[in-house]
UniProtKB/Swiss-Prot annotation:
Keyword field: Chaperone, Cytoplasm, Ribosome biogenesis, rRNA processing
The keyword DNA-binding belongs to this UniProt entry's keyword annotation: no
Localization: Cytoplasm
Job of this protein: An accessory protein needed during the final step in the assembly of 30S ribosomal subunit, possibly for assembly of the head region. Essential for efficient processing of 16S rRNA. May be needed both before and after RbfA during the maturation of 16S rRNA. It has affinity for free ribosomal 30S subunits but not for 70S ribosomes.
Domain PRC barrel: start-end pairs: 91-167
Protein name: Ribosome maturation factor RimM
NCBIfam families to which the protein is assigned, alphabetical: 16S_RimM (TIGR02273)
Single annotated GO MF: ribosome binding
Gene: rimM
Subunit and partners: Binds ribosomal protein uS19.
Organism the protein comes from: Erythrobacter litoralis (strain HTCC2594)
């Protein structure tokens, strides 16, 4: 994908302590990618420090945040950087944000849903897909590993899943 859409590296989930630190949910690229940047959201937030919370997230301090009350107001804020600030992708690589929102179809051409999230539990990335159509009892999802056996191809418009990995109704 070659658009200019900023990429989200983390989301603020709440305050941590009384000095204005915030808890972060790391998205896709992890703590090291976050540490590589000092400015987020077009310069509105300046990172002073960041460390692991030892639970898969992080604790960060921003120069503009002076106390718990200000930190709480940032809950739900995503931390974005310009796409050009990240390293170029090699063949077969992707940013999580590039997959989210893609239509999901089987290799037989049947539309099965839309990518709503990407997870990584250590072994490989896992794509979470919301089924089409949304059932009366609420959204149903299924997960597919981002392996060559499960995901046949992807581009800026869709992700193609091997039929064996597309969960039937």
């Amino acid at each position: 994908m070659t658009d200019n859409t900023p990429l989200t590296l983390a989301a603020i989930t709440g305050a941590h302590g009384v000095r204005g630190d915030v808890r972060l949910k790391l998205l896709g690229e992890g703590l090291e990618a976050l540490k590589a940047h000092s400015s987020f959201n077009e310069g509105t937030l300046t990172l002073k420090s960041v460390r692991s919370d030892n639970k898969g997230g992080a604790i960060a301090r921003f120069a503009e945040v002076q106390g718990r009350e200000q930190a709480e107001k940032l809950r739900g804020t995503t931390l974005t950087v310009p796409r050009e600030a990240l390293p170029p992708l090699e063949e077969g690589e992707y940013y999580f944000a590039d997959l989210i929102g893609l239509d999901a179809v089987t290799d037989a051409g049947k539309r099965v849903g839309k990518v709503i999230d990407v997870h990584n539990y250590g072994a490989t990335d896992i794509v979470e897909i919301a089924k089409d159509p949304v059932p009366e009892k609420g959204m149903k999802t299924f997960m597919v590993p981002m392996t060559t056996h499960a995901v046949v191809e992807w581009n800026g418009e869709r992700i193609v899943i091997a039929t064996d990995f597309a969960h039937p109704d």
